[in-house]
Amino acid sequence: GNVVIRNTKDGTTIIAGNVFQDEVTERTLATYKPLMIIKQEADSIYVTADTLFTARLSDLYKAKDSVVKDTVKGTTVVTVNNNKKDSTNRYFEAYRNVRIFSDSMQAVCDSMFYSFKDSTFKLFQKPILWAKESQITGDTVYLFTKNKKADRVQVFENSFLVNKLDPEVYNQIKSTRMDAYFKD
């Protein structure tokens, strides 16, 4: 059936035909035409794929509490991992036929990783990104967002940018690595 999951902590909504959720580990797997909406101020980001998966970032990196012994004073300091309830302690992955839509840009790729910690979309397997009159391609594309808006892009291996200037005039840039910035 149709399932809707709203996470008010990180401002996301998942709509899918089928959802498997583990409330203990806070992992969610969505299939059958899943759609994730990342709520932003004026321009939300919509991500669709064959499969969406989301979980705690600290589980991915196995963040643990640590114990440190102070050899000078002979005391023990315990550092507790408080990321378990942090709203930025989330990531999501999208697999197969990934599509990203927003008012300012669109993208397609085969698979994607997004971390709420650094607000970076990592696009893999033949990614293509469109913004206004520009198209960017490469083997891997990192899309960095700042204040919930597209800020800059890093393109790795086989970078290519096409930018339309006039109806019959285009800029074309090809390189092994590219850094591009968005401006209003």
Task: Describe the residue ranges of each PLM region.
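Structural signature for solvent-exposed beta-strand/loop edge elements and short helix-capping sites
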Residues: 1-184
